[in-house]
Swiss-Prot record:
Binding, Zn(2+): 7, 10, 44-45
Assigned protein family: Belongs to the archaeal Rpo10/eukaryotic RPB10 RNA polymerase subunit family.
UniProt subunit comment: Component of the RNA polymerase I (Pol I), RNA polymerase II (Pol II) and RNA polymerase III (Pol III) complexes consisting of at least 13, 12 and 17 subunits, respectively. Pol I complex consists of a ten-subunit catalytic core composed of POLR1A/RPA1, POLR1B/RPA2, POLR1C/RPAC1, POLR1D/RPAC2, POLR1H/RPA12, POLR2E/RPABC1, POLR2F/RPABC2, POLR2H/RPABC3, POLR2K/RPABC4 and POLR2L/RPABC5; a mobile stalk subunit POLR1F/RPA43 protruding from the core and additional subunits homologous to general transcription factors POLR1E/RPA49 and POLR1G/RPA34.
Principal subcellular localization: nucleus
Gene giving rise to this polypeptide: POLR2L
UniProt cross-references to InterPro entries, sorted A to Z: RNA_pol_su_RPB10, RNA_pol_suN_Zn-BS, RPABC5/Rpb10
Record-annotated membrane-spanning stretches: none
Higher taxonomy: Eukaryota, Metazoa, Chordata, Craniata, Vertebrata
GO biological process terms held by the UniProt record: regulation of transcription by RNA polymerase I; transcription by RNA polymerase I; transcription by RNA polymerase II; tRNA transcription by RNA polymerase III
Name of protein: DNA-directed RNA polymerases I, II, and III subunit RPABC5
Disulfide bonds: none
Function: DNA-dependent RNA polymerase catalyzes the transcription of DNA into RNA using the four ribonucleoside triphosphates as substrates. Common component of RNA polymerases I, II and III which synthesize ribosomal RNA precursors, mRNA precursors and many functional non-coding RNAs, and a small RNAs, such as 5S rRNA and tRNAs, respectively.
Length: 67
């Protein structure tokens, strides 16, 4: 859905790193190297970006029925 603002475990802010992470992946970085470049060293914070599934664009296609 929407990238969480903070890490669920330690509380570090990770929401502002999503766009930069995608940019690094487009620049042919591996996932691990991209996370290292963003300064995410803890595995709890790394999993927040690695496990995120970006579904918001697909969900916007389904508008609720108007009455």
């Amino acid at each position: 859905m929407i990238i969480p603002v903070r890490c669920f475990t330690c509380g570090k802010i990770v929401g502002n790193k999503w766009e930069a992470y995608l940019g690094l992946l487009q620049a042919e970085y591996t996932e691990g190297d991209a996370l290292d470049a963003l300064g995410l060293k803890r595995y709890c914070c790394r999993r927040m970006l690695l496990a995120h599934v970006d579904l918001i664009e697909k969900l916007l296609n389904y508008a609720p029925l108007e009455k």
